[in-house]
Swiss-Prot record:
Record bears the keyword Repeat: yes
PROSITE patterns noted in UniProt: WD_REPEATS_2, WD_REPEATS_REGION
Pfam family, one: BOP1NT
Localization (cell): Nucleus, Nucleolus; Nucleus, Nucleoplasm
Name the UniProt record assigns to this protein: Ribosome biogenesis protein BOP1 homolog
HAMAP family: BOP1
GO cellular component: nucleoplasm; PeBoW complex; preribosome, large subunit precursor
Organism per entry: Leishmania braziliensis
WD repeat positions: 365-404, 575-615, 617-655, 659-701, 712-743
PANTHER family tied to this protein: RIBOSOME BIOGENESIS PROTEIN BOP1, RIBOSOME BIOGENESIS PROTEIN BOP1 BLOCK OF PROLIFERATION 1 PROTEIN
Primary localization: nucleus
Length: 743
């Protein structure tokens, strides 16, 4: 149907047959030649082979080929008189006019009643070929050419019946030879290749089931009401309301970067001025690949087929893919945020005083690296262990050197016994643990009790006399425990155990009483170990001690428990394969913390089982410190991180602080956290960082960690220790400097 026209008859396909009969009747009455307007297929076939009709005079002529067109070719009749534009004509259904002409005058409707229209359709012989033009409110009669055009369009034919689309096609002169055809020799694909595979069949079946399911669901959905046609604005600018996502998608999109067009130097026959000279070629060859501006030098070829393969094709395509992958797809508003607002609000460090902030003392005399420092329980004396084989004890307040103990080998660690009822200074020296009683550091009764505590069980008669003699000796300030009642002849035959002998090291650790020479030096008891002692720690009561030998070839003997009062030695872990780095006893509960290279294990000493395992994220753990309350602990590692673990929070670090630039070698909590909630970390970058770490009793509050001070040294820091009752910090460095930092 032509646009803008409506047919008077709606009989469908049968209407054209009636129209065909009427036109034939009209043609007979006028005496014209036999013309078939709508020929059937048989008639067209007969006309093609030249068969005449029954009377021999019939002929088949297509509509439009013999009809003489009397219509005028002027375009004035076809001009659009109604100039209302492309609007719905329903807007004028209640008006007396149908629109306006080019001069703005109204075009009035033709008023005809239904009876008049019926009579016109009955009396008019051309009623079957008459259509109504709603735009101009008039009837138009279709010519034979128009009917033939409609007839051709309905059957998907060309609009011009005389047009032959195959007139320019030449006749195929190629003769098919089955014997020489490739497919005739069974070399083509078999029928099996056209059968879909089993997995393809399953995929298709799955898609069919999905479509059927969607169709069934769509039938169950309630039918949506069709919206009425909304009024349209005649002079709208085409603005479309969009949501934020759609507007961002279409208006903030950034086009992908285009490949730059090739330059003249990339031509296969560039001008002579673009060709490089020999000097330029040598300079290009000397440059590195990443420093070259281009990956090739211009060359001249006689023809394009002489151009070789571009060796940098794959790299260029890869770089192009990277450019497309990493190019921003849309414009985004950059958020300008003040970096200070991202930091948590912390109290002013000045409000958290006291804490160590100034250098007050230098404890001189060391000639090598000081690997360990320890403060006595009363805070009066400071012990240091140095690589020059000496253990020195200083008075904290004055810096006076009270005593030096020659151990004969580098000292790995020194530590005072935390119990105030025992006056013991222990030192780790290669394959042994050495116990010294500094008599000047405690009362005589405490010294006597300490000697009996270390030597009481399993002594022979001569050893009891020696112990009694040691107990009767007056202890003077600045002097070590000596045995003056024994003569040189009585001490000459005493056997000494060589701790460096291979056979002796293979034995279990055993307690050994000091020889006369060692007693003169102040050594009371030694414990021979099977491997080099790296670290050790005391229990809070001073009776138990744990020693670590990480380089022992027997893995379960890396951790050794010692009971000093009964001289018992036992290995608590029989099936243990990890390398240990540090250990600590819980200050209040029967728990034992053992740090390995990548975790911290918490053992219950009463139940003899592993209670918890804390994952230390990062590098290899180096040191461990337990909070005096026992619910938190610190772990240092080789990645410059200090991890704060909350046992009530999680098995993972509560805070992970990276304040240093080197390996964290030492860290320690202040023993008196109720008055001084402080902890310090020392690293190989020569800095000691002091933190305020407040732990609350309320479980709804997290621990508060605030950095308050940075204490700088010239060399790596190996040890840190707090004063037991003051906010003083003692540090030791690689160059043998031992300092005291006070508030």
């Amino acid at each position: 149907m032509l646009p803008g026209y409506t047919a008077e008859s709606k009989d469908g396909a049968h209407g054209y047959e009636r129209l065909h009969d009427i036109i034939l009747q009209d043609s007979d009455a006028d005496g014209e030649d036999d013309v078939i307007l709508f020929p059937h297929a048989e008639e067209l076939a007969n006309a093609a082979v030249g068969i005449d009709g029954d009377d021999g005079n019939g002929r088949v002529v297509r509509l439009g080929t013999t009809q003489h067109l009397d219509e005028s070719d002027s375009s004035e009749d076809e001009a659009t008189l109604n100039r209302v534009g492309d609007i719905p004509l329903e807007w004028y259904k209640d008006e007396k006019h149908i629109g306006y002409d080019i001069e703005g005058k109204k075009l009035m409707k033709a008023e005809r009643s239904a009876l008049e229209r019926l009579l016109e359709a009955t009396d008019d012989p051309n009623a079957m070929r008459t259509i109504y033009d709603a735009l101009h409110d008039e009837k138009k009669t279709l010519s034979n050419a128009d009917l033939q055009l409609i007839f051709n369009l309905q059957r998907n034919r060309t609009t011009n019946s005389n047009y032959d689309m195959y007139s320019g096609v030449q006749e195929d002169t190629v003769v098919f030879d089955p014997l020489n055809h490739p497919l005739a020799r069974s070399s083509g694909p078999s029928k099996k290749a056209f059968v879909p595979a089993l997995h393809d069949t399953k995929v298709i079946a799955k898609m069919v089931r999905r479509l059927r399911k969607e169709e069934a669901e769509s039938k169950l959905r309630p039918a949506t009401e069709e919206k009425e046609d909304e009024d349209q604005l005649l002079w709208d600018d085409g603005h479309v309301e969009m949501d934020t996502h759609t507007h961002f998608k279409y208006f903030n999109r950034v086009p992908k970067p285009k490949v730059p067009p090739p330059g003249t130097f990339e031509s296969y026959r560039p001008p002579p001025e673009y060709l490089p000279s020999e000097r330029a070629k040598q300079r290009q060859a000397r440059l590195r690949t990443i420093d070259r501006r281009e990956h090739f030098l211009p060359q001249s070829f006689d023809a394009l087929r002489h151009v070789p393969f571009y060796h940098h094709t794959i790299q260029d395509r890869y770089q192009r893919c990277l450019d497309l992958a990493f190019f921003p797809r849309a414009q985004r508003t950059r958020l300008v945020v003040d970096p200070d607002k991202l930091l948590p609000e912390l109290p002013n460090p000045k409000d958290l005083r006291p804490y160590p902030e100034k250098l007050s003392f230098h404890y001189k005399g060391h000639t090598a690296t000081v690997r360990s420092v320890s403060v006595s329980p009363n805070g009066q004396y400071l012990a240091t262990g140095c690589d020059d084989h000496l253990v020195r004890v200083y008075e904290v307040q004055t810096g006076r050197l009270m005593k030096r103990y020659d151990m004969g080998a580098p000292v790995q660690q020194v530590e005072f016994c935390p119990s105030k009822s025992l006056n013991i200074l222990a030192a780790a020296v290669e394959y042994s643990l050495v116990f010294v009683v500094p008599t000047f550091a405690a009362h005589a009764l405490v010294n006597d009790h300490t000697i009996r505590f270390l030597r009481a069980p399993g002594l022979s008669a001569g050893q009891r006399e020696a112990a009694h003699a040691l107990g009767a000796v007056d202890t003077l300030g600045g002097r070590a425990v000596t045995q003056t009642t024994l003569d040189a002849d009585e001490t000459a035959h005493e056997a000494t155990t060589d701790l460096h002998d291979v056979e002796e090291r293979e034995k279990r650790a055993e307690f050994l009483d000091a020889s006369a020479k060692e007693r003169n030096a102040g050594i009371v008891v030694k414990i021979a170990m099977h491997a080099k002692v790296k670290k050790f720690c005391f229990h809070i009561k001073g009776d138990y001690l744990c020693a670590l030998c990480p380089k022992d070839h027997v893995k379960y003997r890396q951790t050794i428990m010692l009971q000093l009062s009964k001289r018992k030695v036992f290995c608590p872990f029989r099936k243990f394969s990890e390398v240990v780095t540090d250990c600590r006893f819980h200050p209040r509960e029967p728990l034992f913390f053992l740090a390995t290279t990548n975790s911290v294990r918490c053992y219950n000493l009463m139940a003899h089982r592993l209670q918890r395992r804390f994952k230390a994220s990062g590098g290899v753990t180096t040191c461990l410190s337990i909070h005096p309350e026992g619910d938190n602990f610190l772990v240092g590692d080789t990645t410059s991180h200090t991890s704060w673990f909350d046992m009530d929070f999680s098995d993972k670090p509560y805070k992970r602080m990276r304040s240093h630039k080197g390996v964290v070698n030492a860290l320690a909590f202040h023993p008196k956290t109720g008055a001084y909630p402080l902890f310090a970390t020392g690293a190989s970058d020569g800095q000691v960082h002091v933190f305020h770490g407040m732990v609350y009793d309320d479980y709804n509050k997290n621990a508060l960690v605030v950095p308050v001070k940075i204490l700088k040294h010239q060399r790596s820091v190996y040890a840190v220790a707090w004063h037991p009752s003051l906010a003083w910090l003692f540090t030791s460095t690689e160059d043998g400097v031992v300092t005291a930092w006070t508030e």
